[in-house]
Amino acid sequence: MRGLRKRGCLFLVGGVGYSLLEIRWRRRTHWTMAAAGGLCFSLLYGLCGKMAGRSRWKKSVAGSTVITGVEFLAGCLINRRLGWGVWDYSRLPGNVMGQICLPFTFLWFLLCLPVTALCDELHRREGRCTLSQAVVR
């Protein structure tokens, strides 16, 4: 149950956090962006755990790749298959099918810099808590 609760919390933090960021940036959001944000934050948390000891910029490059991949898959489903038209990058440079583009991949990299720091801190605290719980037992 702890694993499920932790995953749910990560998903919620990512979903709410990204939705608020998008509202600030675009003045609107869509519920699917909360789902994508939750998935991305959960994946970034796992990525930071696997890349422990690596530099923040390497984690951020990997993170922006993960986010761009999620964005592409979500865009193919949400915008192209379902036709909901949540976003369209077709006028931006380096776009692929209007679903992802180079400028936003760079923005995801910049966003990943503080997010990977947060994930690293969460991992550090989780390790500290686990160790202290083990000592008490």
Language model segments and positions:
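Aromatic-rich, lipid-facing transmembrane alpha helices and their immediate juxtamembrane interface loops
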Residues: M1-R137
